[in-house]
């Protein structure tokens, strides 16, 4: 039996991979040297001792909530548009565009306000606007809204975000030494992402649960003893009789009513979740007053870590 000789091609080193690996080594070494130059208590990757400073701990909590609300609403509205308004993914994303433009316009104003007023006051205003925005959304959200009104709802929802984000980020550094700046920035960004993950999961679960709840309640009216249901069933049966006569028309009519029931139940579930977010924002107003009364430039409200 004749064996075929196989020639092995020499492996050519991946230049891009080597450069990337070398870059990671250099960055790790630089980070290690920077961490070693810090005081011992600030060398940990995440220094949880920073949470003993009340101002920082409150800011971390508020950032979890704000980041969670931002990410949850960014998922909820396109999800509502695609499932119930039958938007394409592209069209649902375009409905969020106006909110991004609003953020660009409001961000400089929020920065000016943060430099003049205490962070707790700005946050209280921001969370009050959040509560009003979500309540407004819950009372105006329906299955017949237009693309323009859907974009307007997004503008209303994101308008308070710059006030809250900038104020929390600035207030988180009050009372902390400069050596902890990197730690503060890292933890604040980390808890924001954690809050986003938690809220996306929770709001999705609540929407599903409330949809089932409303389906059960609405289905109680789908009885032959209900004149409204009988009239609707008769009208749809007559409409479908030309397409599917006899039992087929009745089945098609009941299917149409059931689809409408599912849509109404899902719409009410989205209204419920926005009401939940509104009440959460009301509670965040109270949390804002746990922060220091100091304005920017008035000095640290607490003693530096020693």
Where are these regions (language model features)?
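Hydrophobic transmembrane architecture of multi-pass small-molecule transporters
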Residues: 22, 193-287, 292-293, 299-306
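12-transmembrane solute porter fold
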Residues: 21, 39-213
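N-terminal low-complexity segments that are often proline-rich with Ser/Thr-Pro
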Residues: 1-31
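Structural signal for alpha-helical transmembrane segments and their membrane-water exit/capping regions
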Residues: 3, 27, 32-40, 206-211
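Residue-level signal for alpha-helical transmembrane segments in multi-pass membrane proteins
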Residues: 32-36, 109, 136-140, 207, ...
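Helix-loop junctions on the cytosolic side of multi-pass membrane transporters
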Residues: 3, 31, 39-44, 290-299
């Amino acid at each position: 039996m004749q064996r075929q000789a196989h020639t092995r091609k020499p492996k050519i080193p991946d230049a891009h991979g080597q450069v990337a690996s070398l870059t990671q080594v250099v960055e790790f070494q630089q980070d290690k040297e920077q961490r070693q130059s810090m005081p011992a208590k600030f060398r940990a990757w995440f220094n949880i001792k920073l949470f003993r400073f009340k101002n920082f701990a409150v800011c971390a909590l508020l950032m979890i909530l704000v980041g969670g609300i931002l990410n949850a609403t960014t998922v909820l509205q396109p999800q509502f548009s695609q499932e119930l308004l039958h938007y394409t993914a592209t069209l649902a994303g375009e409905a969020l565009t106006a909110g991004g433009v609003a953020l660009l316009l409001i961000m400089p104003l929020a920065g000016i306000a943060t430099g003049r007023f205490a962070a707790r006051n700005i946050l209280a205003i921001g969370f009050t606007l959040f509560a009003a925005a979500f309540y407004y959304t819950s009372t105006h959200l329906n299955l017949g809204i237009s693309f323009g009104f859907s974009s307007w709802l997004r503008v209303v929802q994101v308008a308070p975000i710059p006030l809250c984000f900038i104020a929390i980020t600035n207030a988180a550094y009050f009372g902390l030494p400069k050596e902890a700046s990197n730690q503060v920035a890292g933890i604040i960004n980390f808890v924001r992402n954690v809050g986003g993950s938690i809220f996306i999961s929770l709001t999705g679960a609540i929407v599903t649960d409330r949809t089932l709840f409303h389906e059960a309640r609405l289905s109680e009216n789908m009885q032959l003893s209900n004149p409204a249901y009988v009239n609707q069933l008769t009208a749809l049966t007559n409409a479908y009789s030309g397409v599917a006569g006899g039992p087929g028309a009745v089945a098609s009519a009941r299917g149409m009513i059931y689809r409408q029931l599912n849509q109404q139940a899902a719409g009410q579930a989205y209204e419920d979740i926005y009401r939940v977010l509104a009440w959460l924002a009301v509670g965040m107003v109270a949390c804002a007053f746990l922060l220091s009364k100091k304005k920017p430039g008035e000095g640290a409200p607490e003693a530096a870590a020693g």
